[in-house]
Amino acid sequence: LEGLRYYDDYVKEGRYVNDREFTHFSHTFHELQGMTWGILGLGAIGRRVADIAGMFGAKVIYYSASGASAQEGYCQADFDTLLKESDILSVHAPLNQYTEGLMDQKAFHKMKSSAIFLNLGRGPIVREADLVKALNEGEIQAAGLDVLSGEPMAADSPFLSVKDKSRLLITPHVAWAAVEARQRLMKIIAGQIKDFFKL
């Protein structure tokens, strides 16, 4: 996404007007084809992400922190393999005794220096100071977060000390918040209330 910001600025600042070629090649990016997309938590959401990554040609591997049995269609890996092989690692797991603090300094140290880390699960799965250290020391390439340990973000959040801000993208817990998703949630809650009171 940071690349999109670069290209948008490039065009809107008038620099594209002066290009000699129809395409701007100076800022590179890569396809998902041939990359390994690791998923921590292959539940309903993780499986949808796996399906999409697979459609774009990525090899998908996953790790189940709870030790759940293998999911058909995708390669189950141990945690070390997930960390070492993933070009992109996305978290979709719930917070529980198996996942709290799982992504710590030791875990980030095992990842590729070119890896992108995404947390779309729960904030406390990540030791935030360890992620900041991994970004600042180049142990991973970039991170995208939709969840934090404390929400809204604290004024003294360690994420504010990331040296290269372009390597970290944070959204305010909105991955779930599409209008349609909220409408579905309200219908589910209404149905559960009716069931409880036998209405």
Where does each model-flagged region fall?
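Rossmann-like dinucleotide/phosphate-binding beta-alpha-beta segment
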Residues: 23-113
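Conserved functional loop/turn residues at catalytic and ligand-binding sites
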Residues: 15, 36, 41, 87, ...
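Rossmann-like dinucleotide-binding domain for NAD(H)/NADP(H)
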Residues: 114-116, 120-199
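Short clusters of hydrophobic/aromatic residues that line enzyme substrate/ligand-binding pockets
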Residues: 16, 102-103, 153, 159
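Phosphate-binding beta-alpha-beta segment of Rossmann-like dinucleotide-binding domains, i.e.
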Residues: 1-36
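Short, flexible loop segments at the rims of nucleotide/cofactor-binding pockets, characterized by
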Residues: 16-17, 67-72, 94-97, 121, ...
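Oxidoreductase and adenylate-handling cofactor-binding alpha/beta cores
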Residues: 1-9, 35, 52-58, 190-195
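Short, cationic motifs built from Arg/Lys/His that form the positively charged side of catalytic pockets
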Residues: 2-6, 52, 107, 112, ...
